[in-house]
Design a protein with these regions (language model features):
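A conserved acidic beta->alpha catalytic loop
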Residues: 21, 36-45, 63
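Conserved nucleotide-sugar donor-binding catalytic segment
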Residues: 75, 135-209
Length: 243
């Protein structure tokens, strides 16, 4: 069973297109869990208009925090495989099938994406190249985050290990990515499986660099490492890897 987890807030402009691109790739027993953080536009009306029993909407934390909203939606996910999704992208038709193939060998898969404008015109053909993504887990932990949430799919064991989120992390994807990298197995794949839409209301990364100071980034990364080292994600799990 697959759980697609979406955190929404005032996403009426693009949520319909995104849901349509996702639902046609899922089986009847899969689910789309949506945590809505108090949208005041037509987001919920559009979602309800699909009348699809695979869609389940839960109330978000009402704090307008993507990290808290994603934590909430993950708590409700029942699937053996978890796919994270932003509310404004579009999935390529082979995203689920491609990721599922790799998830038979690895616990977490991070796919590439093409970066587009709001009309899906390609701005950058490769998100990995735009963000200078490294596949080295030490580099990702200590220097620059290589994990983009909407590109991530992982097994239930990664979800269970990552929850609950520590309170002192900058963003949900850097935490989940490092949990997966240091306790399970991660695979970066070059397949561009998402149209990663950039527009004025975008919350996620845009390739322009971090909004945090270097000192803040160092503190955030220390918090990530500290939470892993103190075994927050399970007894002896830092020393254990699935063979």
């Amino acid at each position: 069973m697959i759980s697609v987890c979406i955190a929404t807030y005032n996403g009426e402009k693009y949520i319909g297109e995104q849901l349509a691109s996702i639902l046609k790739q899922l089986e009847a027993n899969d689910e789309v869990i949506i945590s809505d953080d108090g949208s005041t536009d037509a987001t919920l009306s559009i979602i309800n208009g699909f009348q699809d029993v695979r869609i389940k909407v839960v109330s978000g934390p009402q704090k307008h925090s993507p990290t808290l909203n994603f934590e909430n939606v993950l708590h409700h996910a029942q699937g053996d495989y978890i796919f994270l999704s932003d509310q404004d992208d579009v999935w390529k038709t082979n995203k689920v099938a491609t990721c599922m193939k790799w998830l038979q060998k690895y616990d977490c898969v991070i796919c590439n994406a093409e970066v587009t404008d709001e009309h899906l015109n390609i701005l950058f053909p490769s998100l990995f190249k735009l963000l200078h993504v490294s596949k080295n887990k030490i580099y990702n932990a200590l220097w620059k985050n290589g994990y983009t949430g909407c590109c991530m799919a992982f097994t239930r064991c990664v979800k269970d290990a990552a929850l609950p989120f520590p309170k002192d992390i900058p963003m949900y994807d850097i935490w989940i990515g490092n949990v997966a990298a240091f306790t399970y197995s991660v695979k970066f794949i070059d397949d561009r499986l998402i149209s990663f839409r950039r527009h004025p209301a975008t919350n996620s990364c845009n390739g322009k660099g971090s909004k945090f100071s270097k000192w803040q980034q160092i503190r955030f990364r220390w918090n990530i490492i500290k939470n892993i080292l103190k075994n927050k994600i399970g007894k002896n799990s830092f020393l254990w890897k699935r063979k």
